[in-house]
Amino acid sequence: MDDAFTVDDLIACYARGVFPMADAREDESLFLIDPERRGVLPLGTFHIPKRLARTVRNGPYEVRVDTAFDTVIENCAASRPGRLDTWINHPIQRLYGQLYARGLAHSVETWLGDELVGGLYGVSLGGAFFGESMFSTARDASKVALVHLVARLIAGGYELLDTQFLTEHLAQFGVMEISRADYRRRLSKALATPGDFYGLAAGATGIDCLQAISQAS
């Protein structure tokens, strides 16, 4: 894929069910992925382990939205023990920054005091949210962000949370695999549904998020 790939091309890719990746951080090229089996997280059956629910309910974290998007994606791209490289290269980082500027990409951030210790980012189109990546430097920090994301999507009337792939880490929350054809059907319905990423009340607490998720089950 050449340098002519624009943010509008990226939006069109998501709308037809494909997404970009790179082979390595320093590789400037992109390629498109269209998995035969797609990971999705049904919002109505999201599972929260008991210990995580206690952390969400009692702290010590504060969760913010869209206050440090660039820092979140930078952390997601950083090398970590057991993962020396990343699929998030500089063109991807630039394109998602442009999506964020258009209000189509968002970050959910977990803070411990003034320190960003976890978070995730993704793309929002209609009633579909495409989770891209997450990071954590403190216990359960990215998981707390995921709980807040799910509550936000439920409150905003979203139909689809696309996780791209099913991993052992995501399976504990109820992520499942569906066929490409089933995914396309769900995506088409979700894109036709208006989703409000800011539908969750400002200042919603962890308890508020747990209640929203429980009511949707």
From Swiss-Prot:
It comes from Caulobacter vibrioides (strain NA1000 / CB15N). The gene is aat. One of its GO terms (molecular function) is leucyl-tRNA--protein transferase activity. This is Leucyl/phenylalanyl-tRNA--protein transferase. Functions in the N-end rule pathway of protein degradation where it conjugates Leu, Phe and, less efficiently, Met from aminoacyl-tRNAs to the N-termini of proteins containing an N-terminal arginine or lysine. Its main location: cytoplasm. HAMAP family: Leu_Phe_trans. It is found in: Cytoplasm. InterPro entries: Acyl_CoA_acyltransferase, Leu/Phe-tRNA_Trfase, Leu/Phe-tRNA_Trfase_C.
